[in-house]
Amino acid sequence: MNRLIIVCLVAAMIYSTIALPMKEDISNDERPISVNEEPVKKNAAVAGAVIQGATLTFQVLDRILTVLGDISRKIAIGVDNESGRKWTAKNAYFFSGTSDVVLPYSVPNGKAFLYDGKKTRGPVATGAVGVLAYSMSDGNTLGILFSVPYDYNWYENWWNIKVYSGSKRANKWMYENLYYNASPHKGDNGWHEKSLGYGLKSRGYMASSGQTKLEIRVTRA
């Protein structure tokens, strides 16, 4: 009788092994890709990104404006670093308006950073006006002004760029210095060049509309 029970148990074990094969554990990383499945490509040309300087175009800035949506006052900014120095973000200061984007932190030589600004949400009479500050690897600071006003009956688009000696943060003083005292450029749909000192020069373009773009290239003099 005992031998019969043992034989039955062995037979049951063999049957269960055949009928229930071991479950295969496939993690997400090892999951086979369907022939119709394509890898997702992330578009790096968005506000807050750092891209190759040579790929900075007006089309890139136009896409940033599109992403911002239907806002009456907005700006897409692209600044190309061909200075031979590394830039490190200090801060952004807004005299008017705001941005939801973090200022790109590290901008090596040969790269360009992308940023944006917009009027404050709601029925408020504000434009997009501010200053960006970047510390350069030579110990000096690059200040960049952008000004897109709300009321074009009284104001116009302006931009500026300047190298400050030593370490400086973007603030109201820097804004007023760049806007009133440091020969700003009008946003007039034209290119403007100037010497920045410290062995550098700039060339930039700003459109004249309320939904505008600003492209600046900083190179060795």
Curated annotation (Swiss-Prot):
Name the UniProt record assigns to this protein: Deep sea actinoporin Cjtox II
Signal peptide: 1-19
GO BP annotations listed: cytolysis in another organism; monoatomic cation transport; pore complex assembly
Assembly information from the UniProt record: Octamer or nonamer in membranes. Monomer in the soluble state.
Record key words, sorted: Cleavage on pair of basic residues, Cytolysis, Membrane, Nematocyst, Secreted, Signal, Target cell membrane, Target membrane, Toxin
Tissue: Expressed in actinopharynx and in gastric filaments. Is not expressed in tentacles.
Assigned GO CC terms: extracellular region; nematocyst; other organism cell membrane; pore complex
Disulphide bridges: none
Residue span(s) of the pro-peptide: 20-42
Amino-acid positions noted as binding phosphocholine in the UniProt annotation, renumbered to this chain: S96, V129, S147, P149, Y175, Y179, Y180
Organism of origin: Cribrinopsis japonica (Deep-sea anemone)
Similarity annotation: Belongs to the actinoporin family. Sea anemone subfamily.
Location(s) in or outside the cell: Secreted; Nematocyst; Target cell membrane
One Pfam short name: Anemone_cytotox
Annotated region described as Trp-rich region, which is important for the binding to lipid membrane, given as residue ranges: 147-162
Gene3D superfamilies with a match to the protein in the record: Cytolysin/lectin
MF terms (GO), sorted A to Z: channel activity; toxin activity
Function in brief: May be involved in digestion of prey. Pore-forming protein that forms cations-selective hydrophilic pores of around 1 nm and causes cytolysis. Pore formation is a multi-step process that involves specific recognition of membrane sphingomyelin (but neither cholesterol nor phosphatidylcholine) using aromatic rich region and adjacent phosphocholine (POC) binding site, firm binding to the membrane (mainly driven by hydrophobic interactions) accompanied by the transfer of the N-terminal region to the lipid-water interface and finally pore formation after oligomerization of monomers.
SUPFAM superfamilies with a match to the protein in the record: Cytolysin/lectin (SSF63724)
